[in-house]
């Protein structure tokens, strides 16, 4: 039998079982757990495109026509991809049919090859992923819709779904993620047609009677946002959650920093055990001072972080005060405004936030775009936090001296499957699984989490790192992110989703508003609990000292040092 050295094999076909890769310049090492391309019975039946390679007529490419059946040829095949997802770290071919993932396994020509479950035919396009990591598109569930250019930045970072509220650079939007009222919701849904991004909008949830809240849900809001700047009282919380229970949408909350209408215990009591998504759960982004982080221990609370406090570094505290003053329309000349801002910034709780992420007690990551957070850094900050925790805390249960697979799965779930579950869209997006929308992000391992090579939306290339369009080949400088054909014309509307409430979809608001994008309803939200947060469902007993701000989880003091240096930073950004 012919053999090939392991390194030569990896360079030709990508890594296989037992091979290890470093993620960017972090201390995180993955190890390939399985190789689905071996379903042919072993090595030797791999497919690869190019001169002298195997995807040629009568070889790895057969004669079958494209169609909907498993025996038909797929529209596009991604060869030899290294999939990194919450469910595993595996090598596989990926077949795309229409906008969705049709199969994950072994591609080729079943007329001459064994074990083929992805058929390559004359109508099949090829994307070569040898040596590349492929992840599900990220989901950012905390967007202030302050400017549409955020979407360009987010897409270029590997985010393919953005959820939040706002109407542009309005004062209310600067501070709160709310698109208030049916008219504003309609305008934002119409604007969404222009962007190669899955979008969903939050209505304003601050009301003590349900009529105006229900009106926003009927108009298309996929969630309601409770924000202290509008008055997050126990009455408003109870009313908002009652409407959510009736309409199967999510409620996101930014609680009462000043403790004017109650303390954290009063807010938890107002939840009445109902599911809720708590934004910036550490508290620097807002929430009961100093102990909002107690909600991490509640079974019905789905906690997330925003990225300005991720991870805790020597610069974190210094940058927060000015950010906070601007975002919440505060005046540094007013003593009460300054005290309000300073009450939210606590080194002890920010340090504990790092550890709670590593324990799987904070379930999600998001940006808080242009409202103290950076829309293009959700993915980067997630992996910087994972790196810092490995360096400071060592291995997680399930990891070994060879790999950090358990930690990698925990952290990737924070911006993929868990926000999808929390917001009722995991049937469409959030992971690389058969039947789901083909939002896929391709990374060179050295650039993982920092700069993707290619972004697919709904099975079609929407963005790529592309060289000079006038060059003789695609690679000459300057290489930068450029929109591809999936970002234009009718292809855009066919390859991206707009999420609506079930009530709005049933009422056919798409026709009434004149929408062109594919529409999908959120569902199954009210039954989601903390235990459903994949790899991130821990509910420790939380204690926070009101005087010292020290944080304990299950009696253990949570503290760590700020990072002096981080990976995935200046080495990658010269300009």
Curated annotation (Swiss-Prot):
Free-text remark on how the cofactor is bound: Binds 2 nickel ions per subunit.
CDD domains: Urease_alpha
Annotated ranges, domain Urease: 137-575
Main location (coarse class): cytoplasm
Molecular function GO terms recorded: nickel cation binding; urease activity
UniProt keyword rRNA-binding present: no
Protein name according to UniProt: Urease subunit alpha
């Amino acid at each position: 039998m012919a053999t090939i050295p392991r390194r030569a094999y990896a360079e030709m076909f990508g890594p296989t079982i037992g091979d290890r890769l470093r993620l960017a310049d972090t201390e995180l090492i993955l190890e390939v757990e399985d190789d689905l391309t071996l379903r042919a019975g072993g090595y030797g039946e791999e497919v690869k495109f190019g001169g002298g390679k195997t995807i040629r007529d009568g070889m790895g490419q057969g004669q079958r026509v494209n169609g909907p059946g498993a025996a038909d040829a797929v529209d596009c095949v991604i060869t030899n991809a290294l999939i990194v997802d919450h469910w595993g770290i595996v090598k596989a071919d990926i077949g795309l049919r229409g906008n969705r993932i049709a199969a994950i396994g072994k591609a080729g020509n079943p007329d001459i090859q064994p074990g083929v479950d992805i058929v390559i035919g004359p109508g099949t396009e090829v994307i070569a992923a040898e040596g590349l990591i492929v992840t599900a598109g990220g989901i950012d569930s905390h967007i202030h819709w302050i400017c549409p250019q955020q979407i360009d930045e987010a897409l270029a970072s590997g985010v393919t779904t953005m959820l939040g509220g706002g109407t542009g650079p309005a004062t209310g939007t600067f501070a709160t993620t709310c698109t208030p009222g049916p008219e504003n919701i309609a305008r934002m849904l119409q604007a969404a047609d222009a962007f190669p991004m899955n979008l969903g909008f939050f209505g304003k949830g601050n009301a003590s009677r349900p009529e105006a809240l229900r009106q926003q849900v009927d108009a298309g809001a996929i969630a309601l946002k409770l924000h202290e700047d509008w008055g997050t009282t126990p009455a408003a919380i109870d009313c908002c959650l009652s409407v959510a229970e009736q309409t199967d949408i999510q409620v996101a909350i930014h609680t009462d920093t000043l403790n004017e209408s109650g303390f954290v215990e009063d807010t938890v009591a107002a939840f009445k055990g109902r599911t809720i998504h708590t934004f910036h759960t550490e508290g620097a982004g807002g929430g009961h001072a100093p102990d909002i982080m107690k909600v991490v221990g509640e079974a019905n609370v789905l906690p997330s972080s925003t990225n300005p406090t991720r991870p805790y570094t020597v610069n974190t505290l210094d940058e927060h005060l000015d950010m906070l003053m601007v975002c919440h329309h505060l005046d540094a000349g007013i003593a009460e405004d300054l005290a309000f801002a300073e009450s939210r910034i606590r080194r002890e709780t920010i340090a504990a936030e790092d550890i709670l992420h590593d324990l799987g007690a904070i379930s999600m990551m998001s940006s808080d775009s242009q409202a103290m957070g950076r829309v293009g850094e959700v993915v980067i900050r997630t992996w910087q936090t994972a790196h810092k925790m490995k360096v400071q805390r060592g291995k997680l249960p399930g990891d070994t001296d060879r790999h950090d697979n358990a930690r990698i799965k925990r952290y990737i779930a924070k911006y993929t499957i868990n926000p999808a579950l929390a917001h009722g869209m995991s049937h469409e997006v959030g992971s690389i699984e058969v039947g789901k929308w083909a939002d896929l992000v391709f990374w060179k391992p050295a650039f993982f989490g920092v700069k993707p090579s290619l972004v697919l939306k709904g099975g079609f290339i929407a963005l790529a790192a592309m060289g000079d369009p006038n060059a003789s080949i695609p690679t000459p400088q300057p290489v930068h992110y450029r929109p591809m054909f999936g970002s234009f014309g009718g292809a855009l509307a066919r390859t991206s989703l707009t999420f609506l409430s079930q009530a709005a979809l049933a009422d056919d608001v798409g026709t009434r508003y004149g929408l062109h994008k594919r529409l999908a309803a959120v569902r199954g939200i009210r039954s989601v609990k903390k235990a459903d947060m994949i790899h991130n469902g821990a509910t420790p007993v939380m204690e926070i000292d009101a005087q010292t701000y020290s944080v304990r989880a299950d009696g253990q003091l949570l503290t760590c040092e700020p990072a002096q240096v981080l990976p995935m930073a200046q080495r990658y950004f010269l300009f």
